[in-house]
């Protein structure tokens, strides 16, 4: 009897496990709630040992019913579940309940769902940003097209107007370049040589363009100052480009109060420096009122107009004051500093407060007056010698 009972329990457990496994598979695939298991009420009497022999009829009836139940797994399942109701809640079934499976699935799906939501949100933000950028670019393109269409003139009139604007710009540029070039040439030549001009084309008769300036390789600035040093002293004056050595033999006749001093020949150089600094001066002036570099006697090649109207060139003497303290006097008139003054035959020069006078003459000049003065001086000297004897 006990062996049959244990056998029935084992078979019912097997069926219960297979039924639970089947129910679990159905839950995972179809996600349906399992059929409710019929539990016996807690007040139901527990399984009692088999009745005595007096109730053998009813026991036999029950045994036949149990046999019938073994054929139908559903009834056996309810019996076995009822029999197992005594066990703790955690040991009722070894297979997980549907709610537990659902919780596990939700935990597994949660990170995937969060990742998908995040990706979807990022994609939507990127699409929104892209759409906004494309809309901004489209607005900019429309504005640019509108601006270009506003600036773009009508085809025929636009071409004419563009050509006129270009022509006017070229003319203005050429005119400005010509003015700058002319101004630069005037500054360099210091108004020495007249510049030849070339008339512009027939369209611009009122504007003239000077001859193209040739490059100048002469020293200037600090280099010129370094090269303009003589015997360790920096010379204040630099000769102009038109400086020339004269062919005519000019001379300076100095006088001190009526006394004739030795003649100075000044035709061997293009310039002569006059001053108190004997180390660098070509013509020293020892009077204390004179500056170390007082003035310069300069020969320049300049243009002049002949009697027949033609233009010629000639070397003429000039005097320039180097900004001396007490000035330079030409025919008893003080001249302006840093400015050339043309000298002529028989002009008289004085420097500072010195009493010496310098008369400018050349080899062809009439020196009869000077000879007469020299003769008078010699006669006076002879008379003085005879009186003393």
UniProtKB/Swiss-Prot annotation:
Record location of the Glycyl lysine isopeptide (Lys-Gly) (interchain with G-Cter in SUMO2) cross-link: 28, 104, 214
Signal peptide: none
Low complexity bias (residue ranges): 54-72
PTM-bearing positions, type Phosphoserine: 18, 33, 48, 95, 149, 386
Compositional bias (Basic residues): 73-95
Sorted UniProt keywords: Coiled coil, Isopeptide bond, mRNA processing, mRNA splicing, Nucleus, Phosphoprotein, RNA-mediated gene silencing, Spliceosome, Ubl conjugation
InterPro entries with a match to the protein in the record: Cell_Proc_Reg/RNA_Proc, FHA_dom, SMAD_FHA_dom_sf
UniProt-recorded Gene Ontology molecular function terms: mRNA binding; transcription regulator inhibitor activity
GO CC list: cytosol; nucleoplasm; nucleus; U2-type precatalytic spliceosome
Covalent cross-link (Glycyl lysine isopeptide (Lys-Gly) (interchain with G-Cter in SUMO)), residues: 28
The keyword Ubl conjugation appears for this protein: yes
Gene Ontology biological process terms, A to Z: miRNA processing; mRNA splicing, via spliceosome; negative regulation of canonical NF-kappaB signal transduction
Description of post-translational modifications: Degraded by the proteasome upon binding to the SMAD1/OAZ1/PSMB4 complex.
Sites of the Glycyl lysine isopeptide (Lys-Gly) (interchain with G-Cter in SUMO1) crosslink: 28
Region Disordered, residue ranges: 1-212, 363-389
Assembly mode: Component of activated spliceosome complexes. Component of the minor spliceosome, which splices U12-type introns. Binds SMAD4 and CREBBP/EP300. Binds the SMAD1/OAZ1/PSMB4 complex. Interacts with DROSHA and SMARCA4. Component of the SNARP complex which consists at least of SNIP1, SNW1, THRAP3, BCLAF1 and PNN.
Protein name according to UniProt: Smad nuclear interacting protein 1
Source organism per UniProt: Rattus norvegicus
Gene name of this polypeptide: Snip1
